[in-house]
Every structure is written in C-alpha cells, then in structure tokens.
Amino acid sequence: MRLPVLGKDTVRMRDPEGLQDKITRIQRGGQEKLQIISDFDMTLSRFSRNGERCPTCYNIIDNSNIISDEGRKKLKCLFDIYYPLEIDPKKSIEEKYPLMVEWWSKAHDLFYEQRIQKDRLAQVVKEPQATLRDGYDLFFNNLYQREIPLFIFSAGIGDVLEEIIRQAGVFHPNTKVVSNYMDFDDNGILTGFKGDLIHTYNKNSSVLKDTEYFKEISHRTNILLLGDTLGDLTMADGVSTVENIIKIGFLNDKVEELTEQFLQSYDIVLLRDETLDVVNGILQFVTAKN
C-alpha cells in the first residue's frame, strides 16, 4: 500500500516499490531504531513565500541593520558570484568544493569587519521573519514526544539557526545541531567562528569531531535524511551502522535541470514543495504501531 502523501503532485520517486519496502522495514523496526538527520536552510526552512525568496541563516545577517550598507553590497556581490556556481548542474562536487570554501571564508571575513554584537542576534532573527516550512510544528513536536533524535547538520550559522527554531517554540532537547557557530570576545563582539568551516560540500564525517553523538544512538540504525543539495547526501557518513535509509531531497531551484540528477541519489524528490507534509506523513506511518 502506497502512502497517500506520496501521491502529492510535488513528489517524484526513483523506485516506488523499493521505497515502500524501506518504509515498511523502518516501521517494523519501530521508533526506537529511528533517527532523523537533516539540513536546515531550504530544507527545514522555506525556500520562498508568495514568490519571494526566503532568507537563509547567512542572508538574515547579510540583510540586517547590523551590517553596513557597504558590507551588504559586498555580501550581495559574493552571493551573485558564488550561488550560481553552487547549484550549477554542469559542475562536479569536486569542482564546487574550493569555490564554496572561498565563498564562506570571504563572507566570514566581512562579518569580522562589521564587529557584530552577540546581544543583537535575537532581534535580527525576528526582523525578516525567517520561516520554517509548513508543518514544522508537527515535525519537531512529534519527534520530541516520541523521543526520536533530530540531528541538524547545517552549513549556515548555528547561532541564527537555533534562534529561529527557539522563536518558533520548537527547540527541544532531542535536537542536536552541528553548524558554523560564532565566537565572541568578552565584550560580545564577533571575533571568528568556532571549529572547522562547514560549507555545502563538506557535510560529512570530516567535520564531525563530536562522534560521541552517533555512538550514543548507535542502536538507531534506521534513518530519514533530509536535504536540498547533492552535498547533503553525505550527512549520515558519521553513522557506523545503517540498516535502512530514506533520502528525501527538496529541489527548490533549477528544478527542470536538476530533477534527474536528484533522482539518481534521493529516494524521494520534492519539487518546489514548501511543506513538510511528505516527511510528516512518512513519520506518522512508521511510528503508527508505537
């Protein structure tokens, strides 16, 4: 029996029968064996609303009044140069990798110049009304109530990401975030970023220093992986034993050019779908017996 939610017109599947088999096996394993690994920007957060692009964690800072007009122009220039390269279907991940390092590094350098103040971040997040996808409350609350761990692996800004979820009222103890976190001095002024740089195409075990997380939940061998780029496909690399994994890709941009490429790697591809309906539908089904 196919789940009704998989009949949405935004849904594309590489192998519908194989997918249904995976869903059934995950359901049989029960919620005690399940974990969720997800990207944040444009995966848990919306790509657009009413035809307007929604901001990423970086965009929220870029467009805020804590950045000078000159700084904003420079950051917009970086976006205009590097974003088309990030999603270029003709470039390989190997070609994109150094370009993403350049982009993130240049953006971070511009942030340092702005002397960003820690105590202004909460207000900055409120201003653009950064939006989580429709159905976010059911998603976060259902996982929390069923004690299913949610691992958010983001190339965005951890401080901003956490504030968005917190202000939405769904930041629960079952949520673990690995991202680029700001480092502030004793006066609350940005001096750098902590740890290794995380960008779109190195979201794998190479930057996962805190492997204790996956050791603690090593019995959770069934995974739902949520992403919006081909770089997100490696987010489960830190999991030592995987029995079943369902990869769900949100394809937001260059849909016609990238659909086939996404279908080669993701089990489910969602075309311009601003909801978490499919994810929630699968979660409700696989946890129904529990």
Swiss-Prot record:
Amino acids binding CMP: E86
Family membership noted in the UniProt record: Belongs to the pyrimidine 5'-nucleotidase family.
- Gene designation per UniProt: Nt5c3b-b
Chain residues that bind Mg(2+): D39, D41, D228
Q: Which Pfam families match?
A: UMPH-1
Keyword Magnesium tagged: yes
What biological function has been recorded for the protein in this entry?
A: Specifically hydrolyzes 7-methylguanosine monophosphate (m(7)GMP) to 7-methylguanosine and inorganic phosphate. The specific activity for m(7)GMP may protect cells against undesired salvage of m(7)GMP and its incorporation into nucleic acids. Also has weak activity for CMP. UMP and purine nucleotides are poor substrates.
NCBIfam families hit by this protein: HAD-SF-IE
**SUPFAM superfamilies, alphabetically?**
HAD-like (SSF56784)
Q: State any GO CC term.
A: cytoplasm
How does it associate, per the subunit comment?
Monomer.
The protein's enzyme class: hydrolase
- Its predominant location is cytoplasm
Q: List ligand-binding residues for N(7)-methyl-GMP.
A: E86
Enumerate the active-site residues.
D39, D41
Q: Keywords assigned by UniProt?
A: Cytoplasm, Hydrolase, Magnesium, Metal-binding, Nucleotide metabolism, Nucleotide-binding
Enzyme Commission identifier(s): 3.1.3.91, 3.1.3.5
**Enzymatic reactions:** N(7)-methyl-GMP + H2O = N(7)-methylguanosine + phosphate; CMP + H2O = cytidine + phosphate; a ribonucleoside 5'-phosphate + H2O = a ribonucleoside + phosphate
- Output the GO biological process annotations, alphabetical, semicolon-separated: nucleotide metabolic process
Q: What is this protein called?
A: 7-methylguanosine phosphate-specific 5'-nucleotidase B
